[in-house]
Each structure stands twice: as C-alpha cells, then as structure tokens.
Amino acid sequence: MGILKLIRETSARHQHDDALARAGLNAKGWHILFQAMIEAESSYNPTAVSPKGAYGLGQLMPQTARSLGVDPRDVAQNLDGAARYLLAQLSTFQNIDLALAAYNAGPHRVVEYSGVPPFAETRDYIARIHRIRNRLTGQPVSQPSVHLANRRPERPPVHIDLN
C-alpha cells in the first residue's frame, strides 16, 4: 500500500475528532495539515531517523511512541501515533501553530514560553508546513509569518547559598 494512501486512511479515521473543530479545521483541512506535517517530518520516508532518535513518517521519539502504545517501526502504527499526538496538541492548544510547535519542540516548551518558542528550528518547521499546505491546496506558496512568543519564560530566582 502506498504511503499517501496510508496517510489518507489515517487522517480519515481521525477526521471526526473534537480537537479539529476546536482548532478551526474541517475534515479536508485536517487531511491537508496531517499530510503536510508528515512531509515536513520525514519527506515520506518510513525509515527516516533524526539525529535525536525520532523515527518513521511521523518522526516519533521513542518515549512518545511508548506513551502512545505504538511501534514506531510499523508504518501504520507510526502514522496513527503521529495523528493522535498531533490531535492531542490541537486539543490542548486549540491553535494550529501552537499545536505544530508542541509537536516539534514539545508541549512543555509552548507552555513555558506561552506561545511558539523562539527557536529557529520550530519557526522554520511551522513555516515549512504552511508552505506545504499551500502547495497541496493549490494556494500561492509564500513565506508565512509565524508569531513567536514575545517573552522569556518566567522562572523563579535561583538562590545560591555559599556559606
């Protein structure tokens, strides 16, 4: 079975998830977003491995795959895990850019920065997915603007007792 067909089948299984409406996505928008994310993550390579150890089409980290109960080396399970993880981020953040940032940098980073973390990798990742979405829908491909968090994370002061 072809990769694009598996992506379509996976997105179709999840097209009625409540998270989509909360993030302003319909079934078609969800399919395009999911396919664009998979393209950005792995260029449709089911055996892609990142320098950090993420694996497969959805570039699932080993711990994320375990928490989702999927085998990242199984193409269908990897896609299902990626879909469920992205849907969890959409449900939590109710915003496409924040959900993509959470998928890329981790949800704790989005919470820590109260927005898209100011990391070049995350900014470029979100912009790339928007460009792919535009291409897949026949929209003009332009450089989308990604709104980064405008503040540093709040951290309690560190007290060091030298005595």
Task: Describe these PLM feature segments.
Residues 144-163:
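Low-complexity, Gly/Ser/Thr/Pro-rich intrinsically disordered linker/tail segments
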Residues 15-29, 47-49, 94-102, 140-143:
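Surface-exposed patches in mature extracellular/periplasmic domains of secreted proteins
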Residues 38-41, 63, 103:
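Active-site-proximal beta-strand/loop segments in catalytic clefts of secreted hydrolases
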Residues 1-43:
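Export/targeting segments at the very N-terminus of extracytoplasmic proteins
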Residues 33, 49-70, 78-86, 107-108, ...:
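Substrate-binding/active-site groove segments that recognize
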Residues 5-12, 32-35, 80-87, 97, ...:
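Solvent-exposed, polar/charged alpha-helical surfaces in well-ordered, non-transmembrane soluble domains
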Residues 101-147:
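Catalytic and substrate-binding regions of cell-wall glycan-acting enzymes that process beta-1,4-linked
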Residues 1, 21-24, 47-51, 64-75, ...:
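Second-shell loop/turn segments in exported
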